[in-house]
């Protein structure tokens, strides 16, 4: 469950076990544990845990969460969070709660993770939209771009099923579309898709493979890895129609801009730049030297993040 444990790719992992946020609102001498001849207070717990890697990550996620909630709270609705949560829950079915527990998460903490991810994604996308895109960037995007294509796509959970289907479509006189309808496990038995190389709702491996096929050609078995579930799926593609690519990149300028902007969402350096901007706007100051370096990855070159007195 790689993606469930990642808040933002290459940026920060939520540590939900550490309760530093609760410590902030408690008196330092509040007793957490008592025993014969001794007690453990909030202060004891804080001082014991604050230098651990888990605490460092927890504090970083807490800082980013507070900053982005302040600046973008109304940009992500509870409905969006619930929808994303349900999508993952549906993918795991009855094992979802077990997978959450194995990842150190509860439904509530996972929803918080989803919300923060979406807040940061919104900020990154808005910043990307406002960035100046050079002609060089457009030309590079154009060179990699494949315009609209239509393909019959079969999807399988098991590789052996994909192999059996591949043998079936290789047979002389085989009807790929009919076999696809019969064999695919896709919802509603959908097999016909129209998309371009910037498509994000299909597996990236499938889009790349289709982009590389000529009209009328069929693929071998394509293995795709779902980043949200770390689950492999298997696909067979036949491209039935492919638009001729126009010679001038300007004919696709709007679409190319969308693709470039979407690409920024996957760029850790650009993400860090946006987070750094938000932290700077919030005037974040680290007061405890134990956490002096948690924002180092967001600092400008040669800029340190000393603890503030």
Swiss-Prot record:
Q: Does the keyword Glycoprotein apply?
A: no
Q: How does it sit in the membrane?
A: Lipid-anchor
Q: Which residues form the PpiC domain?
A: 146-241
Q: Where is the lipid attached (N-palmitoyl cysteine)?
A: 23
Q: Which reaction does it catalyse?
A: [protein]-peptidylproline (omega=180) = [protein]-peptidylproline (omega=0)
Asked if the Swiss-Prot or TrEMBL record annotates the protein with the keyword Cytoplasm, the reply is no
Give the record's keywords alphabetically: Cell membrane, Isomerase, Lipoprotein, Membrane, Palmitate, Rotamase, Signal
Q: Where in the cell is it found?
A: Cell membrane
Name the Pfam families for this protein.
Answer: Rotamase_2 (PF13145)
Enzyme Commission numbers on file: 5.2.1.8
Q: Which GO terms describe its molecular function?
A: peptidyl-prolyl cis-trans isomerase activity
PROSITE patterns, A to Z = PPIC_PPIASE_2 (PS50198), PROKAR_LIPOPROTEIN (PS51257)
Q: Name the cystine pairs.
A: none
Name the predominant localization: membrane
Q: Give the InterPro entries listed for this entry.
A: Foldase_PrsA, PPIase_dom_sf, PPIase_PpiC, PrsA_foldase, Trigger_fact/SurA_dom_sf
Signal peptide (UniProt feature, chain positions): 1-22
Could you name the Gene Ontology cellular component terms for this entry?
plasma membrane
Its function, per the record, reads: Plays a major role in protein secretion by helping the post-translocational extracellular folding of several secreted proteins.
The similarity comment for this entry is: Belongs to the PrsA family.
Q: What is this protein called?
A: Foldase protein PrsA 2
Query: What is the source species?
Result: Streptococcus pyogenes serotype M3 (strain ATCC BAA-595 / MGAS315)
């Amino acid at each position: 469950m790689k993606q469930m444990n990642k808040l933002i790719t290459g940026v920060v992992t939520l540590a939900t076990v550490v309760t530093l946020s609760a410590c902030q609102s408690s008196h330092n001498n509040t007793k957490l544990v008592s025993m014969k001849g001794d007690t453990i207070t909030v202060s004891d717990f804080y001082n014991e845990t604050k230098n651990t890697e888990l605490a460092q990550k927890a504090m970083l996620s807490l800082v980013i969460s507070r900053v982005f909630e302040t600046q973008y709270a109304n940009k992500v609705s509870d409905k969006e969070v619930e929808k994303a949560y349900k999508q993952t829950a549906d993918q795991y079915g009855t094992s979802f709660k077990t997978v959450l527990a194995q990842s150190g998460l509860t439904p509530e903490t996972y929803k918080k993770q989803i919300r923060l991810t979406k807040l940061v994604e919104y900020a990154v996308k808005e910043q990307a939209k406002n960035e100046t895109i050079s002609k060089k960037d457009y030309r590079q995007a154009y060179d990699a771009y494949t315009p609209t294509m239509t393909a019959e796509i079969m999807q399988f959970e098991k590789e052996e099923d994909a192999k059996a289907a591949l043998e079936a479509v290789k047979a002389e006189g085989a009807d790929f579309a009919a076999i696809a309808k019969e064999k695919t496990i896709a919802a509603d038995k959908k097999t016909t898709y129209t998309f371009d190389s910037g498509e994000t709702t299909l597996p990236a491996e499938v889009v790349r493979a289709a982009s590389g096929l000529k009209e009328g050609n069929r693929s071998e078995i394509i293995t795709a890895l779902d980043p949200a579930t770390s689950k492999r799926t298997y696909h067979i593609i036949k491209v039935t129609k492919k638009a001729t690519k126009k010679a001038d990149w300007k004919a696709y300028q709007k679409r190319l801009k969308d693709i470039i902007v979407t690409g920024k969402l996957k760029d850790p350096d650009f993400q860090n730049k946006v987070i750094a901007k938000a932290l700077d706007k919030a005037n974040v100051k680290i007061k405890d030297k134990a956490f002096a370096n948690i924002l180092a990855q967001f600092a400008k070159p040669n800029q340190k993040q000393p603890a503030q007195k």
